[in-house]
Amino acid sequence: IGQDPFQINRIRDILLAEFGTEKPADRGFTPWDQRTVVHVFSSIEVACLDIIGKIINRPVVDLLGGKRRDAVPFSAYLFYKYEGAGGELEFGTDPNATGWAAARQASALNPAEIVSQAKAMCSAFGFQSIKLKGGVFEPRQEVDAILALHEAFGPNMPLRIDPNALWTVETSIKYGKEMEGIIEY
């Protein structure tokens, strides 16, 4: 607050001075954890770019180098999860829910449940591609989920898997070969 939005690097320096001394013990050890400053700075940087764009009457896309495409496709992002909806339902469920509202409450712990989750998401939101967030179970089970998605949706539905950098190189090669022609990445 009170900083010049045109001085984004100065704002980053202020955040680094405040939060940049975190050690891994302060943020967790998993590879996808990021330092607090990354999360705080990214939101402030976007706000600054929005302010700058409004001041000079240009869209943020122009500040980032210009428009490259007219649309950005979104992917259904599947997670393994236990029963319970989260959000306003906390860990409870609504037995009267249907469609996506019911699916988001259901467990998704095996290939059949992952397919069910994907069908509900794609039906409710029109997704044209699917990504499974893996690194939760043994790789074989996660690959089986991808194969089940491929069987359920067919070859025209782009599929992706993200094992959260938890598969070894050898595991990635082994299962990557098995999924060749089925997944985008």
Feature map (PLM): residue ranges:
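Metal- or metallocofactor-binding catalytic centers and their adjacent structured scaffolds
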Residues: 1-55
